């Protein structure tokens, strides 16, 4: 395969386009658009073209944090959300959904620097409800230098939310 990369950006050194010629002579073209390229538009785009078939992905940002990643649907002629993020006040990911129905939530601690729990298949509101806690507790948990006293509470999710997968980190 032969790779040809195009650089025309002045604000960054990232590639704008890459063209690969496969062994059978077909071309795969990848085009990139970065948020630095259009300051007024917090959108990142990627387009891949192969055999007259294309895939387009767009990602909207809030500052440096990605919020929603969407993929173009040719049949609907619209973008479909594929990945949505929410963040805590420190910029840590608090929840992610890939389809609007399956959620993964995260709990942080050690002065908001490290995740201590990943809970799959539950919304953040359902997680807090099962624990009998509120967002103030999440803030306190995040600010702790050692969350040992709260790990029993977090581990209780395994019984309280049997449909969820609970991973804890120490």
Regions found by a protein language model. Give the residues of each.
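Non-catalytic interaction/targeting regions
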Residues: 1-126, 130-170
